[in-house]
Amino acid sequence: MKPYPIDLVSVVIPVYNEEASLPELLRRTEAACLELGRAFEIVLVDDGSRDRSAELLQAAAERDGSAVVAVILNRNYGQHAAILAGFEQSRGDLVITLDADLQNPPEEIPRLVERAAQGYDVVGSIRAERQDSAWRRWPSRLVNLAVQRSTGVAMHDYGCMLRAYRRSIVEAMLACRERSTFIPILANGFARHTCEIRVAHAERAHGESKYSAMRLLNLMFDLVTCMTTTPLRLLSLVGGGMALAGFLFALFLLVLRLAFGAAWAGNGLFVLFAVLFMFSGVQLLGMGLLGEYLGRMYSDVRARPRFFIERVVRATPSALPSALQRAGFTSSSSEPSTP
């Protein structure tokens, strides 16, 4: 494994209704990046916020000496689509993702850059002393275990978005066109050398989690359908097992009917209904799982954009930080973009 030269670091942060936390987020992220001794840019993607987040991001990008790039999406597309939009606008040799809620402190960024410079393709993180509620921690552990077994990549905290990706990995992810994706899993599919570091985890200081029960359920289906077809194979095995169990149960009822007469068969009617309802439930569950796969295939076949960027606001060349100017990156202000 050879050292990886890093001249420019991009920090991509998806933002959704984070007006209260943005000033502190910008201040702490810029301070952490200044410690790197490298050129940097902070790409903040507004994912259709309903508060003043987009206005604050644009103002931050337009101020003198700003390293902020504001990417404004026309509506809410979800966290991972917003991150991909940020990837598309980033230019760094190393791209770091970070949540806007400050539960993972930006002060950990230099540690990620240090490990990536050693030659790792992907640097993940493990939340130490996680501050989320139990109903969020336990499903996360189950998902992490399932992902490890399915992908064969032993990373322990796929839910933590504080991660670093080499430029080649980012370009490979952008070349993938499926709509339902989970970035940490997708990245590990292209990475040869990966590692993890333990990072601090704080309670959410502003607002509340954007992941409702329905969003978590949708994320679970994204995980299942984007990483493996194993559930479909299991469904076939379950169907075969149920058919065999049904045949054996019917044979068992026939033997009892012959042994105990017609009166016993009448008493066993409710048992038969219970078994029938159980089989029907499993069938409907299987149909729902098939529907999830077919629905995602339909979305991919339509080939619609995963996101639409309404506008991109960058610092003018005269306002770029000196470190960024030395790296040779310049751009015009408020440039329109296409997905």
Swiss-Prot record:
Keyword Lipid biosynthesis assigned to the entry: answer is: yes
What parts of the sequence cross the membrane? 235-255, 269-289
What is one term from the GO cellular component aspect held by the record?
plasma membrane
User: Is Transferase among this UniProt entry's keywords?
Assistant: yes
The EC number(s) attached to this protein equal 2.4.2.53
How does this chain sit within the bilayer?
Multi-pass membrane protein
Q: Which UniProt keywords apply?
A: Antibiotic resistance, Cell inner membrane, Cell membrane, Glycosyltransferase, Lipid A biosynthesis, Lipid biosynthesis, Lipid metabolism, Lipopolysaccharide biosynthesis, Membrane, Transferase, Transmembrane, Transmembrane helix
Give the pathway annotation.
Glycolipid biosynthesis; 4-amino-4-deoxy-alpha-L-arabinose undecaprenyl phosphate biosynthesis; 4-amino-4-deoxy-alpha-L-arabinose undecaprenyl phosphate from UDP-4-deoxy-4-formamido-beta-L-arabinose and undecaprenyl phosphate: step 1/2; Bacterial outer membrane biogenesis; lipopolysaccharide biosynthesis
Disulphide linkage map: none
Query: What GO MF annotations does this protein's record show?
Result: phosphotransferase activity, for other substituted phosphate groups; undecaprenyl-phosphate 4-deoxy-4-formamido-L-arabinose transferase activity
- Per the record, the domain of life is Bacteria
Class of the enzyme per the UniProt entry, highest EC level: transferase
According to UniProt, the reaction catalysed is: UDP-4-deoxy-4-formamido-beta-L-arabinose + di-trans,octa-cis-undecaprenyl phosphate = 4-deoxy-4-formamido-alpha-L-arabinopyranosyl di-trans,octa-cis-undecaprenyl phosphate + UDP
Principal localisation: membrane
Q: Which protein family is named in the record? A: Belongs to the glycosyltransferase 2 family.
Summarize the protein's role.
Catalyzes the transfer of 4-deoxy-4-formamido-L-arabinose from UDP to undecaprenyl phosphate. The modified arabinose is attached to lipid A and is required for resistance to polymyxin and cationic antimicrobial peptides.
HAMAP family given for it?
Answer: ArnC_transfer
Q: What is this protein called?
A: Undecaprenyl-phosphate 4-deoxy-4-formamido-L-arabinose transferase
Give the source species: Pseudomonas aeruginosa (strain ATCC 15692 / DSM 22644 / CIP 104116 / JCM 14847 / LMG 12228 / 1C / PRS 101 / PAO1)
This chain is encoded by the gene named: arnC
